[in-house]
């Protein structure tokens, strides 16, 4: 069965930004078609529960622009890209200072670089 590759990158705040919040992604780099892609973003240097921020997932298909997947607030409120809404779940675990992405029923069209961001 053909495998799909999912690349993870570290997205961190620039050094000149006063906030030293860093986001570290983790998850498999390889998922089979029809399976669920699960990624986690761990926030360090600040609390995910600090008000005023939305925690997002974004992806970039090869040779294309960025596509916003969705975001979550620390309270659990979510908003998803309408074109992906039926396949995507974003959740937050404030006790671990993490938020996660689940993308179900992946296909070759989901091959992309996945970013977490604030």
From Swiss-Prot:
Predominant place of localization: secreted
Region (Complementarity-determining-1): 45-54
Positions of the Ig-like domain: 20-118
Origin superkingdom: Eukaryota
Record Pfam families: V-set
Region (Framework-3) location: 79-116
UniProt-annotated location(s): Secreted; Cell membrane
UniProt GO cellular component terms: extracellular region; immunoglobulin complex; plasma membrane
Region entry Complementarity-determining-3, spans: 117-118
SUPFAM superfamilies in the cross-refs: Immunoglobulin
Entry annotated with the keyword Nucleus: no
Keywords: Adaptive immunity, Cell membrane, Disulfide bond, Immunity, Immunoglobulin, Immunoglobulin domain, Membrane, Secreted, Signal
Stretch list, region Framework-1: 20-44
InterPro entries assigned to the protein according to its UniProt record, in alphabetical order: Ig-like_dom, Ig-like_dom_sf, Ig-like_fold, Ig_V-set, IgHV
Signal peptide region: 1-19
Gene Ontology biological process: immunoglobulin mediated immune response
Framework-2: region residues: 55-71
Known role: V region of the variable domain of immunoglobulin heavy chains that participates in the antigen recognition. Immunoglobulins, also known as antibodies, are membrane-bound or secreted glycoproteins produced by B lymphocytes. In the recognition phase of humoral immunity, the membrane-bound immunoglobulins serve as receptors which, upon binding of a specific antigen, trigger the clonal expansion and differentiation of B lymphocytes into immunoglobulins-secreting plasma cells.
Protein known as: Immunoglobulin heavy variable 4-31
Gene: IGHV4-31
């Amino acid at each position: 069965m053909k495998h799909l590759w999912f690349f993870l990158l570290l997205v961190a705040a620039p050094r000149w930004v006063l906030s030293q919040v860093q986001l570290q992604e983790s998850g498999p780099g390889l998922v089979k078609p029809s399976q669920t892609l699960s990624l986690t973003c761990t926030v360090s240097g600040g609390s995910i529960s600090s008000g005023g921020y939305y925690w997002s997932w974004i992806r970039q298909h090869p040779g294309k622009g960025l596509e916003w997947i969705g975001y979550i607030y620390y309270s659990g409120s979510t908003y998803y890209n309408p074109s992906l809404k039926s396949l995507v779940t974003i959740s937050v675990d404030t006790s671990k200072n993490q938020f996660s992405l689940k993308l179900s029923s992946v296909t070759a069209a989901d091959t992309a670089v996945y970013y977490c961001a604030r």
